[in-house]
């Protein structure tokens, strides 16, 4: 015999969010671009997929929610040696930090401990405030760089193709009713509040009717 709680749950209009439902929500069908669709990994999130393909999910900077990586001194020094020509700020060595009192010259995430010469206890901590240039997202390694090239070629090819907009069945019926009532008098069409409810201009109505005539052989 089922419990009262289970009977209430069975009658409830709120459906239980099962794993099967979650999987359906996760499986996004990508139809907008055939190249992205071919390289899409359904086991990853949208942001992870974009990052893997070398794309950005958001054009702006992150507003929060991302944990910033604090680089160690050894990592900063390795980065300085690798990018010595392009480095805009000098990253001090360990021996240099030991003699620094200015927080603005110590890298953020590092600190200098000042100890008592007699007891060797820490009497002061100077936290670094120097901002070290973060590695830009565009400099990160892309798993499949050929995708970017394919997307650029696809965009260039399709930008030259002019796609003609076809009039819908509803639009055809609307234009037909206007033409049957007014013929080629577009100024009168313009002032018809019942048929021209969106107040299309005479020029716009003329273009639509010329296109409709061409499609219907009139």
Swiss-Prot record:
The keyword Iron-sulfur does not apply. The keyword Lyase does not apply. Residues 1-29, 58-92 are annotated as: Disordered. It comes from the Eukaryota. It is found in: Nucleus, Nucleolus. One of its GO terms (cellular component) is preribosome, large subunit precursor. Keywords: Nucleus, Ribonucleoprotein, Ribosome biogenesis, rRNA processing. Residues 1-23 have a biased composition (Basic residues). One of its GO terms (biological process) is rRNA processing. Involved in the biogenesis of the 60S ribosomal subunit. This is Nucleolar protein 16. The lineage of its organism: Eukaryota, Fungi, Dikarya, Ascomycota, Saccharomycotina.
């Amino acid at each position: 015999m089922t419990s009262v709680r289970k009977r209430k749950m069975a009658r409830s209009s709120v459906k239980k969010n099962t794993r099967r439902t979650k999987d359906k929500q996760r499986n996004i069908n990508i139809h907008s671009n055939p190249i992205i669709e071919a390289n899409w990994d359904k086991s990853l999130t949208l942001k992870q997929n974009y990052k893997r393909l070398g794309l950005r999910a958001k054009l702006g900077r992150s507003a929060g929610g991302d944990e910033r990586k604090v680089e160690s001194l050894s990592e900063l020094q390795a980065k300085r040696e690798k990018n010595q020509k392009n480095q805009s700020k000098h990253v001090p060595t360990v021996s240099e930090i030991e003699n620094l009192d200015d927080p603005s010259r110590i890298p953020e995430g590092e600190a200098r401990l000042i100890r008592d010469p007699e007891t060797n206890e820490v009497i002061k901590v100077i936290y670094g405030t120097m901002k070290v240039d973060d590695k830009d997202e565009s400099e990160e390694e892309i798993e499949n760089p050929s995708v970017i090239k394919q997307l650029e070629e696809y965009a260039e090819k399709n930008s030259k193709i002019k796609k003609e907009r076809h009039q819908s069945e509803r639009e055809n019926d609307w234009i037909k009713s206007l033409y049957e009532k007014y013929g080629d008098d577009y100024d009168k069409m313009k002032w018809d509040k019942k048929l021209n409810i969106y107040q299309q201009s005479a020029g716009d109505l003329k273009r639509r009717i010329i296109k409709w005539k061409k499609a219907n052989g009139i």
